[in-house]
Amino acid sequence: MGRRPKKRGRDIHGVFLLDKPPGMSSNDIMQKVKRLFQANKAGHTGALDPLATGMLPICLGEATKFSQFLLDADKRYLVTAKLGERTDTSDAEGQLVQTRAVNVNLTEILTALPHFRGDLMQVPTMFSALKHQGKPLYEYARAGVTVQRQARPITIFELKFIDYNAPFLTLEVHCSKGTYIRTLIDDLGEHLGCGAHVVMLRRTAVSDYPAEKMLTWEALQQLAESADLSRLDALLLPTDSAVSKLPPLVLNEQQTKAVGFGQRIRFNNEENIYGQVRLFSAENLFLGVAEINKDNVIRPTRMVNRNNGTE
């Protein structure tokens, strides 16, 4: 008996900004969004903890080729920590491992914050998806095994005080890729001498995506039930929005054909643009991403497939 052919989704392309609900993993909610859009392909751009809410860009179709750019992008968070309690996961979903008195005033908090701004070295939490010998760290942690982790460079561009109503402290964080907010709060709690863990975490921004374009899962479901797929498709941001921080370069017809075949081309680099660029045709169609070297040669690195209706 032959295998049943795999059902193929729609060739739909773009980025959907989901306001992630609490209590679900990023992968689970991404799969639900994929099914709702009936998309052939989907990928998210950096997991949020199940406890967390907020901006989760979901790439559909050809946009998945550029998800790494959003993984590497700066992010902003609003976080509330509970002082005086430390957990094994550094958030409210973990087991309480230590309780201490909270003898911390606002002045001490404001004095501590500058220590956590700028370029830092952060040791990732054991409860993370980072791999060790092919296995996520959280699997070791759940088995009671602690793995030696190397500190990684991160940057906290902004750490802003919002509110302190003891024992709850609310901060706004603007950080580089790879920053664990749970670890930041745990480290701050140890610095203050009382311990702390995350009780609320909301991602408010990824790269320069507008927060007002986010839609909740409930709103998306309601729209899907009451309208056809074209209404859902209208919610998608263009594929090239994932690389909007790269300078644009418009190619002529001959150059467009060449890069479409993956060929390198030399050009008259009047604007002295070097490094990564996003390429467009003369008709303003997004072609993909390329690298321009010092010899003014364009080398295509990640191109969209223009045979499947990519916008």
From Swiss-Prot:
Keywords assigned by UniProt, alphabetized: Isomerase, tRNA processing
Q: Which domain of life is it from?
A: Bacteria
Question: One of this protein's GO BP terms?
Answer: tRNA pseudouridine synthesis
Name the EC number(s).
5.4.99.25
Record has tRNA processing as a keyword: yes
User: Can you provide one Gene Ontology molecular function annotated for this UniProt record?
Assistant: RNA binding
Annotated catalytic residues:
D49 (nucleophile)
Name the chemical reaction catalysed here. Answer: uridine(55) in tRNA = pseudouridine(55) in tRNA
User: NCBIfam families, from UniProt?
Assistant: TruB
Stated family: Belongs to the pseudouridine synthase TruB family. Type 1 subfamily.
HAMAP family for the chain: TruB_bact (MF_01080)
Functionally, this protein is described as follows:
Responsible for synthesis of pseudouridine from uracil-55 in the psi GC loop of transfer RNAs.
Quote the protein name from its UniProt record.
Answer: tRNA pseudouridine synthase B
State the organism's lineage: Bacteria, Pseudomonadati, Pseudomonadota, Gammaproteobacteria, Pasteurellales
